[in-house]
From Swiss-Prot:
Protein name: Small ribosomal subunit protein uS2c
Domain of life: Eukaryota
Main location (coarse class): plastid
Sequence similarity: Belongs to the universal ribosomal protein uS2 family.
Any GO BP: translation
Keywords, alphabetical: Chloroplast, Plastid, Ribonucleoprotein, Ribosomal protein
Localisation: Plastid, Chloroplast
Pfam families recorded: Ribosomal_S2
Length: 236
């Protein structure tokens, strides 16, 4: 895998608050190599390490995108949800930003059935099929469609398991991470000072609470995916 330059600036990361970890009482000792200091009761993340692993992650997604691989971005907590959907749409990736339904990947056949149901209901709505039904039946189907859209809207075009999964906040998305590990799907995970850095294939130490920090990490990854996709189109 070729190493590239991704313009990851330490000062820009500091302005985004990427270096602020959790309180010193709330930490995972395995994160010690990624922590540079303690300040006012919180751990400070070593941004040189962040830059290194973010660069590695950008190289990985560029390489995968240049070969036409598919990505899934997962981030369901309120602070991350909008950022995840915008980033995924920009990079033409699949995403989950509301709730991870257990077995979404490990029980893919069930997820596929739900997606087929979702597509059928969307078609029915677009062709005004609901209008031809009794009001009560139409209301039930509309509720079903609304629920499916909430939880599966970001993966509605996914036809198989993703090649790489990007996880925003490892603690929050632990179930998704375990499913990826079970299936052998490569993962890139944003980890704060309370996380285990040994679980994901590439762990990026960073503040997972600040919107600016999450945005910074996502923007770099999405840019790399976009560059890789452009390379794929040019070479195909």
């Amino acid at each position: 895998m070729t190493k590239r330059y991704w313009n990851i600036d330490l000062e820009e990361m500091m302005r985004a608050g990427v270096h602020f970890g959790h309180g010193t009482r709330k930490w995972n000792p395995r994160m010690a190599p990624y922590i540079s200091a303690k300040r006012k009761g919180i751990h400070i993340i070593n941004l040189t390490r962040t830059a290194r692993f973010l660069s590695e992650a950008c190289d990985l997604v560029f390489d995968a995108a240049s070969r036409g691989k598919q990505f899934l971005i997962v981030g369901t907590k309120n602070k991350a949800a909008d950022l995840v959907s915008r980033a995924a749409i920009r990079a033409r990736c699949h995403y989950v930003n509301k709730k991870w339904l257990g077995g979404m990947l490990t029980n893919w056949s069930t997820t596929e059935k739900r997606l087929h149901k979702f597509r059928d209901l969307r078609t029915e709505q677009k062709t005004e099929g609901f209008n031809r039904l009794p009001k009560r039946d139409a209301a039930v189907l509309k509720r079903q469609l609304s629920r499916l859209k909430t939880y599966l809207g970001g993966i509605k075009y996914m036809t198989g398991l993703p090649d790489i999964v990007i996880i925003i906040d490892q603690q929050e998305e632990y179930t998704a991470l375990r499913e990826c590990i079970t299936l052998g799907i490569p993962t890139i995970s944003l980890i704060d000072t309370n996380c285990n850095p040994d679980l994901a294939d590439i762990s990026i130490p960073a503040n997972d609470d600040a919107i600016a920090s999450i945005r910074f990490i996502l923007n770099k990854l999405v840019f790399a995916i976009g560059e890789g996709r452009s390379s794929y189109i040019q070479n195909s």
